Amino acid sequence: MSLNPKQDNWQGKTVWLIGASTGIGRSTASALHALGARVIVSARHAKALDDFVLVHPGKTANGLPTAVALPLDVSLDGALQAAAQTILKAGSIDCAMYCAGTYKEQRATEFNLPTMLEHQRINYLGALQMIDAVLPHFLVRQSGHISLISSVAGYGGLPKSIAYGPTKAALINLAEILYLDLHSKNIGVSLICPGFVDTPLTSQNKFNMPALITPDEAAQEILKGWAKGEFEIHFPKRFTLWVKAIKMLPYRLYFPAIKKFTGL
């Protein structure tokens, strides 16, 4: 049973992707553009966004560019709201996807509050800012889709993840509540929980990353999930299903299993 309206026709739709200069965000924007969507790409790195636009030319029937760079810093209050107003002046937003994120390995023995708060600002509070920017528009239209990229790191506590993991767990809880409250309003909500994807963030890992996939592969998994109307889109399943299974264990078994599974 589909939990969301199936998103399988992107022709003429406008999708705003925040955190689209690299990785999953950029690959998803590229894949959506190929399917006929008008993509608005946002991130801090303006040159990377401009480069994306250069290799994704095209005009809509109304003469609007099919790829637009809208640089911003998600950690600045009001930045996403101002950007949303800029987009809405030219039309509507059909889907908003929050891909922005930061990640730094950190153990509890190396607790660093500034690092913790930076993760909160970018990974979680930025998502709240995006929702604040687009949700009133979606409620008026009685349509739209909110997509949040979390991680399997949000399923349960993992070593070296004290800054990153809690922000991803918060996104999972947030997405569940959004779905419960917005489904009756015909607003879709999807939660994306990747395993290891070869991105600039994961390149800093000094441990083996099982079932590592490319950003392009991740984008295709996301598109398939949207087309099926899934709420949670997790991949690659040969890895994520194991993580889900371990999380079902009682804590007396979970903690040793995680230590053995991660080797950390």
Q: Which residues does each PLM region occupy?
A:
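Conserved glycine-rich cofactor-binding loop
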Residues: 21-22
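Substrate-binding pocket helix/loop in short-chain dehydrogenase/reductase
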Residues: 107-120
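Active-site loop immediately N-terminal to the catalytic Tyr-X3-Lys motif
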Residues: 109, 158-162, 203
